[in-house]
Regions:
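Terminal targeting signals and extreme-terminal segments of soluble enzymes
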Residues: 1-76, 80-178
Length: 178
């Protein structure tokens, strides 16, 4: 079952060039999946009761164009499959006219937060999301060979505002910090 919401690009989400930033895009995608989970009764409070969380394992994001300040956008997400403890989810961001701005493929692990181990999501959960086919986009290989680094970066502190409800660094915050 696909889920969408519409918004406008805010001043607080843009960079010097007047366009949405990558962390801003990731926030939209992440918020869309959270809104869907809340709408189907699988939201933050329900997961907390179960002692579980969906934890991002991998992103593949294609950006065709970053939207600009004030531009109206539609963000859509859907589950594209479940296998064991993994959930596959796709995202799109489009203009009002249907121009594809960005899309993403993601893999999430359903984790028992007490043990830290992945566990199979309950059937009621996977049924609630339903499955729509995967996005028609060639994301290429998921594993990227890291180039040799000629420097070691400086360590940076993780502050309370970087943490999410799972007490982990939020996905978009991580990108901003790195």
């Amino acid at each position: 079952m696909k889920y969408s919401f519409t918004s406008r690009i805010r001043y607080s989400e843009i960079g010097e060039d007047g366009n949405l930033t990558l962390p801003g895009l990731i926030n939209y995608f992440q918020d869309c999946s959270t809104f869907q989970s809340e709408a189907i009764g699988e939201g933050v409070a329900e997961l907390k009761k179960r002692g579980c969380a969906w934890v991002l394992s991998a992103w593949q994001i294609h950006v065709r164009r970053y939207p600009s300040l004030g531009e109206a956008v539609k963000i859509t997400t859907w589950a594209s499959g479940f296998k064991g403890f993994l959930g596959m989810r796709n995202f799109t961001m489009e203009t009002e006219d249907g121009e594809m701005l960005a899309c993403a493929n993601s893999i999430w692990s359903y984790v028992n937060m007490e043990t830290g181990h992945p566990v199979r999501a309950p059937k009621e959960t996977t049924d609630a999301y339903g499955i729509d086919g995967p996005i028609d986009e060639d994301f290429g290989e998921r594993k990227v060979k890291m180039p040799e680094a000629d420097f070691i970066g400086e360590p940076f502190p993780v502050r309370p505002h970087n943490l999410d409800t799972n007490h982990h660094v939020n996905n978009a915050q991580f990108i901003s910090l790195a």
